[in-house]
Amino acid sequence: IDVISGATFTSIGFKNALIDAAKQAEASDLDGFKKNTVVHTAGEAIEKTTDVVVVGAGGAGMATAVQSAQNGNSVVVLEVNSEIGGNTVASGGQFQSAQSYLVWDPADPDATTGVYKGVTYNKVHNATGNIKVLKEILNWNENEFDSKYFDSTPFVAGDIETLSHAGVHAEYLGTLKELKSEIQAYLNWAQPQLDAGKAEGEITLFSTPNLHIFQTYYGGLRQNAEKTSWIYGSYDLVKQFVEGGQDLKGWLEDQGAIFDNSIQPIIVGALWNRENDFKGSDLNGDGTPDPDGKNVKGKTVYNTYFATTRKTLLETVANHADNEIMLRTKVTELITDKDGKVVGVKGVQYDGTPVTVHAKKGVVLATGGYAADIKRVMETNDYWPDGDITTHTGTTNRSSLVGSGIDMAEAVGAATTGMGFTQMMPISWVDNGNLAFGGGHY
């Protein structure tokens, strides 16, 4: 029995009660009972062959596994923890994607409602300051980004009014031009209403994939601590992330996920109102949410993203009998062929049983980062000033996020990028590591 973080004294009291019960029962080995040690015996080595191996059963891993299976591949997922969910199940649970039926429609600009899957919803409205942001983007300098602009002007992350004067990286120029055209059409409709005295919060929200792409670009544009280099998101990856994300909600709903289809909120760290809020799952299709542990948020996140995908992978996809999730299995090594191609993995289960899984088509690493290894975060840091990260700095990540996948990939020659730019949330005290609310809700 382990002590649970956040319930330390309760856990100790529970363990003391068990020891007292063991004494009253005249346990034959009370000292052994107190040691709380479980001895595992390794089984025979396990060796399997499948089409696709996925390492990590978090949001990325399970999405990859299900899509691979839906594409006709057999899949084996290996997860170090005792349950699927990864870091996603410990997150706030929302994902960003603009829902066209809830926002301003240039084809029907005066519409106050939209229809999704046969149900009519009220369109959502702007938050205070949204239109100011749109106007700043509309005036963004279209010249090639000039980092020398900040030789005389301090760079402040999030200050887009200043950032907009420095230009734009060439690969994002096309998106910026398209976005400006979208914004201009919107302002041609919205500005007369503002001029007539209508409040910003009464005007239908503007939100498009192009805005999401461009905000991901400037939201991630950063200087390193020494002010000698810059980093920003790869355009192709950001575009894929945003445009592919437009299909995520429907894909999950087809598997039984439930979302609040009436809102597009914003959470801590986000730049726009385009969050999709989770509501659980309806796996039997009876129209009511499945039990979620007395509305425990972590359980609801699990139901939305993992009860659904797990059922698809192991029960409902056409080739479900060919798929498997191996829990409490730590992958320790990537297997490569003579040409350096990764063709499988080696690992070990919780009891010491060795595991080898060969992949006929590919191996996907979905093991997350290393936020739970604060010393490593400090060692790789190239962004935060001295003193902003200390050994006391806490994390909202799970304890298994220690960079094992990165280590294995580097061991077979994989390159990394952006390792020095760790994202920090404004909810931690640097001096003592205490965390405020972890879900990200205001």
Show which residues each predicted segment covers:
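Glycine-rich loop(s) and the adjacent beta-strand/alpha-helix scaffold that form part
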Residues: 348-354, 358-432
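Short, solvent-exposed loop/turn and secondary-structure capping segments
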Residues: 86-90, 100-101, 107, 263-265, ...
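Active-site- and interface-proximal helix/loop "cap" or "latch" segments in soluble metabolic
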Residues: 1-36
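Mid-to-C-terminal Rossmann-like scaffold of FAD/NAD(P)H-dependent oxidoreductases
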Residues: 38-50, 419-442
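Beta1/beta-strand and adjacent pyrophosphate-binding region of the FAD-binding site
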Residues: 41-60, 76
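Conserved redox-cofactor binding core of oxidoreductases
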Residues: 148, 152-353, 374-375, 429
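Glycine-rich FAD pyrophosphate-binding loop
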Residues: 70-90
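N-terminal glycine-rich dinucleotide-binding loop that anchors FAD/FMN and/or NAD(P) in oxidoreductases
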Residues: 90-139
